[in-house]
Amino acid sequence: MKVVAPMAGICDSEFLLRLVPYGFDVLTLGGYNVDEATILAGEEIIKRGRKEFNYPLDTVFSQIELEANNIKSACDALVSCNLRCVNPDSVVRVSMIESVDIVEINCHCRQEELLSLGCGQNMMLRPDLEDYISYVVDNSNSKVSVKIRANVEGVDTLSIAGLVDDCGADYLHVDAMKPNAGADLDLINDISNCTDIFLIGNNNIKSIDDCYNMLDAGADGFSIARACANGILNFDLNEL
């Protein structure tokens, strides 16, 4: 699985379709803010100059459907949608969009406005995380991914990985960030050894060799963000 990772304010259908020729087979829309609280947070993030996909609550779901339909009409890639919301109902609602293959719960974002809501990487600190993921898994009409950030202070990454696996999610998407050390491939190996879930490794993939290193560490697939953030990839994933 070769995934374009979510990039807020960047990964819409027009951008993602430019990357298909490089060999990606999963295209991630978003992240999208999909409830009132996260939409208000998105407005504050935009005010300080960051890019966001931020639509009113009465239009965001139709916008996601439009973007997903655009991709499906142009290629055979799977469409994933990375979502931020305080409660899981909006994730389930997006899963009902026929052209969305995967809904991805965002436990990754670091923006303070979202962290203050218990969203983004602070999802991993919530006592109801298991209930949240299980609700999505039990009610979703699509496959379910959970994207986490590794090595967050106060969070046991291996415990979170096990929780996601136990909840029955289809994919665990791990930003194997390790401050000042590149991708934490040892952690990817540890997660692979202690879970059965399909593991997507992310962080610092800038070449074909980096892809192989991530796979050799135990990931079942990988995702790329920054290396393709300008809509161009300087290596060809079709070689894998």
Which stretches of residues belong to each language-model region?
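Catalytic cores of alpha/beta
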Residues: D12-P21, N87-S99, N151-D166, C194-I197, ...
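Helix C-cap/helix->beta junction micro-motif
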Residues: C75, N139-S140, C167-G168, T195
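Glycine-rich phosphate-binding active-site loops on the catalytic face of alpha/beta enzymes
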Residues: L27-A37, D101-L114, A169-A181, A217-L237
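Well-ordered, non-transmembrane segments within structured domains
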Residues: A77-S116, D128, S159-D165
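Short acidic, glycine/proline-enriched helix-loop-strand junctions
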Residues: I45-Y55, S142, C194-G201, E239-L240
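Hydrophobic faces of well-ordered beta-strands that scaffold small-molecule active sites
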Residues: K2-P6, D25-G30, V79-L83, V103-I105, ...
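N-terminal capping/small domains of soluble enzymes
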Residues: M1-V79, L83-N87
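Active-site-adjacent beta->alpha loops and helix N-cap segments on the catalytic face
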Residues: T38-E43, F61-A68, P88-S90, C109-N141, ...
